[in-house]
A protein has these predicted regions:
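Beta-barrel outer-membrane channel/assembly domains of diderm bacteria
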Residues: 2-4, 8-122, 127-128, 156-165, ...
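Surface-exposed loop and membrane-interface regions of Gram-negative outer-membrane beta-barrel proteins
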Residues: 39-121, 133-146, 178, 196-203, ...
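Detector for outer-membrane/organellar transmembrane beta-barrel domains
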Residues: 213, 218-406, 411
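Aromatic- and glycine-enriched pocket-lining scaffold segments that form the walls
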Residues: 144-262
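Outer-membrane beta-barrel transmembrane domain signature
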Residues: 117, 180-201, 363, 377-406, ...
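Transmembrane beta-barrel outer-membrane domains
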Residues: 25, 57-63, 103-110, 144-150, ...
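Transmembrane beta-strands of outer-membrane beta-barrel pores
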Residues: 36-42, 86-92, 131-135, 169-175, ...
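Extracellular structured ligand-interaction cores
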Residues: 27-29, 63-65, 81-83, 108-110, ...
């Protein structure tokens, strides 16, 4: 029997398939995001710090995304497309900044396949699989408070009654360190000089899997009003290598549940969103300004809970004057504080309040003034231990606070529209905090430590922490 050439067969099959798509011109698209600029001091403010005090006049460094995508096939009313996104971040103002330099990062953020129109009963529904963004955020503070981004698959916008249903399964492989568990014998877990977890063969084993099962249903309630109900189940799964170690561990970490109710309201003056989130389980310990998608491997958060409230939007009071706002409150408790237990934690509860107000006033067709004021307070109640009695001696509170005031002269294509991009901001910013708050030293949180070499050994003298500063600069932002 004559052998079939697989390549020839594939080419022949493609040729026969071409007539179904012969009249279709693919739709290619190019998009992206950019923020960059220069300022008088290098504060190295990361995303978490912006979440505390807002974006305006407080975004050093460069960040960008390039989006490339195209429709690759169409059969009847079904369209197949691919989309990709590459992200770049640079923390320092260097001319030649490579991947080998600290603070420079390139990441493949999205790469997924989408099919629209496959279901005869609902041509607007989508089927997707691959790596993609799956998150909600507050623009003014850049807080990605609901972030499940990763590899996955799902269906979106399925018509159900008056609303739309979306289902998704996403998975992350994240580092997991079990060294906190003293019941794991040293013969099973060892560390190298950098403290990384090694197996008995000297290989690093530090990954575990978290599966996210997400369901959301959005439906209209009245003119301009939309309600979304959402539930996410977070299920951790250890890889096979980890079972060897964890068979000798006293405690395990469990999954988590997240429930959300979000209400969007559009009206003649603008738009507003209010969302309430309840978390229960091992994702609670991400802290007040995290995203709720991180699973605490220590086991101390298995029974913890967190309530969070978000309210943000934009209101145009007149043709020239408007206000963008962001309000956030959160409270968590229920941590395991068992003495002589390897999953003991000293945290009892934490609570936070954050408010950002950004009024803006249009000067001309392409210019406006923006003034952003922000405030946050974050209090953590912790147990402190009586070593002599091996028990908790009581509780103490630690409070972090910060304030920011930024004034910016902004140029954009349409200064009457808050969302108009691209824009260039000429800004001056005043930052203030307390001793437990954010660090405003020019070169980051380690800058206020002075290292002095003595004859015997290096000595570290801790200087005065910078709790207030003034910066000025020019910042640009664009999306397309």
């Amino acid at each position: 029997m004559k052998k079939v050439n697989l390549l020839a067969a594939a080419v022949l099959a493609a040729a026969f398939a071409m007539p179904a798509q012969a009249d279709y011109t693919p739709n290619a698209y190019f998009g992206g995001f950019l923020r960059t600029g220069v300022q008088s001091k290098s504060l190295f403010a990361d995303d978490a710090e912006k979440a505390h005090l807002g974006r305006l006049g407080y975004e050093p460094g460069t960040y960008g995304e390039i989006v490339l995508g195209t429709d690759i096939a169409k059969v009847d009313e079904t369209v197949w497309s691919v989309s990709s996104r590459v992200g770049y971040r640079a923390d320092k103002n260097w001319d030649w900044y490579t991947q080998n330099d600290s603070g420079s990062h390139i990441a493949f953020r999205e790469y997924f396949l989408n099919v629209k129109g496959f279901f005869d009963f609902d041509k607007d529904a989508n089927i997707w699989t691959g790596k993609r963004f799956y998150r909600d955020d507050t623009y003014v503070n850049d807080l990605r408070y609901y972030d499940l981004s990763g590899l996955g698959a799902g269906v979106e916008n399925i018509s159900l009654g008056e609303g739309k249903l979306s289902l998704a399964w996403l998975r992350r492989d994240e580092s997991r360190d079990y060294l906190w568990d003293s019941t794991v014998d040293a013969s099973y877990v060892a560390t190298d000089t950098d403290g990384k977890r090694l197996d008995k063969d000297g290989k690093v084993k530090s990954f575990g899997t978290v599966n996210f099962l997400d369901v959301k249903y959005a439906f209209p309630v009245w003119d301009g009003g939309n309600l979304q109900l959402r539930h996410t189940s977070m299920i951790p799964h250890r890889n096979s290598d980890s079972y060897f170690e964890y068979a000798h561990a006293e405690h395990d970490y469990k999954g988590a549940q997240r429930y959300s109710v979000a209400f969007n309201q559009g009206f003649s003056l603008g738009w507003n969103k209010t969302e309430i989130i309840y978390d229960h389980g091992s994702n609670v310990n991400w802290g007040a300004f995290g995203n709720g998608g991180w699973i605490d491997p220590s086991g101390c958060s298995n029974k913890a809970y967190r309530w969070s409230l978000f309210n943000f939007g934009v209101v145009n009071f007149t043709e020239r004057f408007g206000l963008a706002h962001n309000l956030y409150m959160t409270y968590s408790s229920g941590y395991d504080n068992t003495i002589n237990s390897t999953n003991a934690t000293d945290k009892k509860s934490d609570k936070a309040f954050q408010l950002t107000l950004r009024p803006f006033y249009q000067l001309t067709k392409m210019t406006k003034l923006e003034l952003e004021g922000a405030f946050y307070t974050h209090t953590t109640k912790s147990y402190f231990k009586n070593d002599a009695n091996d028990a908790w001696a009581g509780t103490k509170n630690s409070n972090a606070q910060g304030q920011k005031l930024s004034l910016a002269y902004v140029i954009s294509p349409d200064a009457s529209n808050f969302w108009s991009k691209p824009e260039i901001q000429f800004f001056v910013t005043y930052l203030h905090g307390n001793e437990n708050g954010l660090e405003f030293s020019e070169y980051g949180s380690s800058a206020y430590q002075i290292h002095v070499d003595s004859a015997s050994a290096p000595v570290i003298h801790e200087g005065t922490k910078t709790t207030n500063t003034v910066i000025f600069g020019v910042h640009g932002e664009a999306w397309w």
